[in-house]
């Protein structure tokens, strides 16, 4: 049987979630780099796998699948080595996980990714910085963090939905928030420091997926260091996007 192939760029939040999930659960796979900076996601070869030209994507036998949440659900169901807590057999628990994942797409992801892209990361991908779009994304991110703090992280549980073990939703959302690492430290702390439950939940998810979590995020940490050096040298524009709108 052919080994699973994962097409990914580790600078992509959902790509990292899929890679970490495979590593934590002992799923053997070949990782194929699709460089977003080089726009390889738009190549004819990759579009044969995902016509939408986005990472991550997988090929498992004859199956070609894209969209990270669909991939995580498929892997949870297809590989016996995956522990039940990632995507429980209990249908009510599954439905609640789906509710978090659906919320994520139009709330936390739009806010976090939009803010990082438009305030810092855009030029690395050939896109201009957009302060207006960044400010709008920051408003959504702030609202989403408050919703995480007060609704999705219930009681004293370590993970989403009152669970004491992580699900695919925890991994997906935490990988999203890790993208904030490329921000200036003061800016990142300004966004996160008032959300103590969120900060602890991020740490809980990291610990539950070590050492694979840090290993998969190494490229992000290197990019963070590069941005910080450029800030110190004065060659990188500061976000300067304190919420005043």
Curated annotation (Swiss-Prot):
Keywords of this entry: Detoxification, Nucleus, Oxidoreductase, Peroxidase, Peroxisome, Transferase
Species classification: Eukaryota, Viridiplantae, Streptophyta, Embryophyta, Tracheophyta
GO cellular component: cytoplasm; nucleus; peroxisome; plastid
Residue span(s) of domain GST C-terminal: 90-233
GO terms of biological process kind: toxin catabolic process
Highest taxon listed in the record's lineage: Eukaryota
Functional note: In vitro, possesses glutathione S-transferase activity toward 1-chloro-2,4-dinitrobenzene (CDNB) and p-nitrobenzyl chloride (pNBC), and glutathione peroxidase activity toward cumene hydroperoxide and linoleic acid-13-hydroperoxide. May be involved in the conjugation of reduced glutathione to a wide number of exogenous and endogenous hydrophobic electrophiles and have a detoxification role against certain herbicides.
UniProt subcellular location: Nucleus; Peroxisome
Protein family membership: Belongs to the GST superfamily. Theta family.
SUPFAM superfamilies in the record: GST C-terminal domain-like, Thioredoxin-like
Residue intervals of the GST N-terminal domain: 2-83
Residues bound to glutathione: 12-13, 41-42, 54-55, 67-68
EC class (word): transferase
GO molecular function per UniProt: glutathione transferase activity; peroxidase activity
A Pfam family hit: GST_N
Protein encoded by which gene: GSTT1
Main location: nucleus
Enzyme Commission number(s) from the entry: 2.5.1.18
Motif (Microbody targeting signal): 243-245
Protein name as annotated: Glutathione S-transferase T1
Gene3D superfamilies: 1.20.1050.10, Glutaredoxin
Catalysis performed (reactions): RX + glutathione = an S-substituted glutathione + a halide anion + H(+)
Organism of provenance: Arabidopsis thaliana (Mouse-ear cress)
């Amino acid at each position: 049987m052919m080994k699973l192939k994962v097409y990914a760029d580790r600078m992509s939040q959902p790509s990292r979630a899929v890679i970490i999930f495979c590593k934590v659960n002992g799923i053997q796979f070949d990782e194929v780099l699709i460089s977003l900076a080089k726009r390889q996601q738009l190549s004819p070869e990759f579009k044969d796998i995902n016509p939408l030209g986005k990472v991550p994507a997988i090929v498992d036998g004859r199956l070609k699948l894209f969209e990270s949440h669909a991939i995580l659900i498929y892997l949870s169901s297809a590989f016996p080595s995956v522990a039940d807590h990632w995507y429980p057999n209990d249908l009510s628990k599954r439905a609640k996980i789906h509710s978090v994942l659906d919320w994520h797409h139009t709330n936390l992801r739009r806010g976090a990714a939009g803010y990082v892209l438009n305030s810092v990361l855009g030029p690395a991908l050939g896109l201009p910085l957009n302060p207006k779009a960044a400010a709008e994304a920051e408003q959504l991110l702030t609202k989403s963090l408050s919703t995480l703090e007060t609704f999705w992280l219930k009681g004293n549980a370590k993970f989403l939905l009152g669970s004491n073990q992580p699900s695919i939703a925890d991994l997906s959302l935490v990988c999203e928030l890790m993208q904030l690492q490329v921000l200036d430290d003061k800016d990142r702390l300004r966004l996160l420091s008032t959300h103590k439950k969120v900060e602890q939940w991020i740490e809980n998810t990291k610990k539950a997926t070590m050492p694979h979590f840090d290993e998969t995020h190494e490229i992000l940490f290197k990019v963070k260091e590069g941005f910080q050096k450029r800030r110190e040298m004065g060659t990188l524009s500061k976000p300067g996007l304190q919420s005043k709108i």
